[in-house]
C-alpha cells in the first residue's frame, strides 16, 4: 500500500458518498441488508447511506433505493462542491492512485491513516472510488479533506500535497484492471474538477509525482496513457 493506503474513523467529519440510484427493491420476508447488498453487487454501507438506515433493521414492505446503477455519479459531489466556488483552495494537480489492496472504502482507509499512520486529518485522499467490495462499484466517496478544503497526504511531495487533489480507486492494479464503472466515475469526477477549479490543473498519477523508484501506484493495469489523452496537461 502506498501513500495511497488509508483507513479510518474520520473523526468529526462525516464521509459523503454517491452511487447513482439503480432503482428500488421492496423488502421481502427473510431479506437482510447483507443479502440484498450481495444480490445487487453493492455494500451494506451504501444501502444504509442511500436509505438513511443507521442499523440493520429493515421491514417487509420497505422500499429501498439501490445504489450503483446508471445516472449521474456526480450528484453528491456537485452538491458538496458548488457552494465552494470562489472559495476553493489553490489546486494545481489532480492525482490518481490505487489503494494497492483488493477491498476497502474511505472509512476503512481513513481509520488506517488516522490511527496507524498518525494523520491528524484522517483519510489521505480527497475522494475514494469504490470497486463493489466495501462500497458500490463506481461509488464516489467524498473525504473530509475535500469537504474542508484541506491539503492532501497522498504523495511525498509537499508541493503536490498542498495543491493536489488526491483520488484513490479501490483495488490493486498491478494485478488487475479497474472496473469500467470505476473508470467512468474517475473520468466524470476529473472532468468536473477541471471545470470547477478556476486555475489550470496538471493531471498525473502517483508514480509520476514521486518517481517509479518510490512507487508503482496506480499499477501497471491502470489506463494512465488513456487518462492523459482525456486530460492533457494544461501547463
What is the role of each PLM region?
Residues 21-29, 35-75:
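Extracellular LysM carbohydrate-binding repeats and other cell-envelope/extracellular binding modules
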Residues 22, 42, 53, 89-91, ...:
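Extracytoplasmic
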Residues 33-34, 44, 106-110, 183, ...:
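Extracytoplasmic/secreted envelope proteins and their assembly/folding machinery
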Residues 70-90, 131-134, 139-142, 146, ...:
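Basic/polar, cationic surfaces and motifs that engage anionic cell-wall
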Residues 82-148:
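Short, conserved "active-site rim" segments that organize catalytic pockets and cofactor/ligand binding
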Residues 32-36, 93-101, 171-180:
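Second-shell loop/turn segments in exported
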Residues 45-52, 78-79, 107-114:
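N-terminal post-signal-peptidase region of extra-cytosolic proteins
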Residues 1-19:
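N-terminal export signals
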Amino acid at each position: 500500500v502506498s501513500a495511497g493506503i488509508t483507513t479510518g474513523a474520520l473523526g468529526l467529519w462525516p464521509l459523503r458518498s454517491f452511487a447513482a440510484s439503480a432503482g428500488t427493491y421492496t423488502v421481502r420476508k427473510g431479506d437482510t441488508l447483507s443479502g440484498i447488498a450481495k444480490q445487487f453487487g453493492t455494500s451494506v454501507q451504501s444501502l444504509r447511506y442511500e436509505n438513511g438506515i443507521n442499523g440493520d433493521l429493515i421491514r417487509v414492505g420497505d422500499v429501498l433505493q439501490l445504489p450503483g446503477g446508471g445516472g449521474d455519479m456526480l450528484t453528491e459531489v456537485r452538491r458538496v462542491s458548488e457552494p465552494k466556488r470562489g472559495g476553493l483552495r489553490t489546486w494545481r494537480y489532480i492525482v490518481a492512485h490505487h489503494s494497492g489492496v483488493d477491498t476497502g472504502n474511505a472509512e476503512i482507509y481513513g481509520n488506517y491513516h488516522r490511527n496507524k499512520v498518525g494523520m491528524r486529518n484522517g483519510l489521505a485522499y480527497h475522494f475514494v472510488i469504490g470497486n463493489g467490495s466495501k462500497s458500490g462499484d463506481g461509488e464516489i466517496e467524498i473525504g473530509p479533506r475535500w469537504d474542508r478544503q484541506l491539503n492532501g497526504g497522498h504523495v511525498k511531495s509537499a508541493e503536490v500535497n498542498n495543491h493536489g487533489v488526491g483520488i484513490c480507486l479501490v483495488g490493486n492494479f498491478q494485478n488487475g484492471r479497474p472496473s469500467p464503472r470505476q473508470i467512468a466515475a474517475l473520468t466524470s469526477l476529473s472532468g468536473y474538477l477541471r471545470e470547477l477549479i478556476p486555475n489550470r490543473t496538471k493531471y498525473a498519477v502517483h508514480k509520476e509525482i514521486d518517481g517509479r523508484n518510490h512507487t508503482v501506484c496506480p499499477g501497471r493495469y491502470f489506463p494512465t496513457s488513456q487518462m492523459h489523452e482525456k486530460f492533457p496537461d494544461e501547463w
